[in-house]
Amino acid sequence: MKRNQRKVLIGIVKSTKNAKTATVQVESRFKHPLYHKSVVRHKKYQAHNEGEVLAKDGDKVQIVETRPLSATKRFRIAKIIERAK
């Protein structure tokens, strides 16, 4: 997979209970094709949380697609956009 083709998502860290792993909730908004109403969908991703970028619960982070790190982890935390208050 080429670096410029990797998925880049922004979400909120919901849990850091697992070792070296953070659960990140990503929100996607789109307009319903028939009813033209704004629809919000949420999806949770498991992301690798280790090294110089160590996220905590409530942080807004950017996650980047990477090679499979475990059975469920396909993303790593690239940077912290905003710390939790």
From Swiss-Prot:
CDD domains recorded: Ribosomal_uS17
Protein's UniProt keywords contain Ribonucleoprotein: yes
InterPro entries in UniProt: NA-bd_OB-fold, Ribosomal_uS17, Ribosomal_uS17_bact/chlr, Ribosomal_uS17_CS
Coiled coil region boundaries: none
Keyword Cell division: no
One Gene Ontology molecular-function label: rRNA binding
PROSITE patterns membership: RIBOSOMAL_S17
GO cellular component: cytosolic small ribosomal subunit
Keywords: Ribonucleoprotein, Ribosomal protein, RNA-binding, rRNA-binding
One protein family per Pfam: Ribosomal_S17
Source organism superkingdom: Bacteria
GO annotation, biological process: translation
HAMAP family: Ribosomal_uS17_B (MF_01345_B)
Record's subunit section: Part of the 30S ribosomal subunit.
Family, similarity comment: Belongs to the universal ribosomal protein uS17 family.
Function comment: One of the primary rRNA binding proteins, it binds specifically to the 5'-end of 16S ribosomal RNA.
Protein name: Small ribosomal subunit protein uS17
Organism: Mycoplasma pneumoniae (strain ATCC 29342 / M129 / Subtype 1)
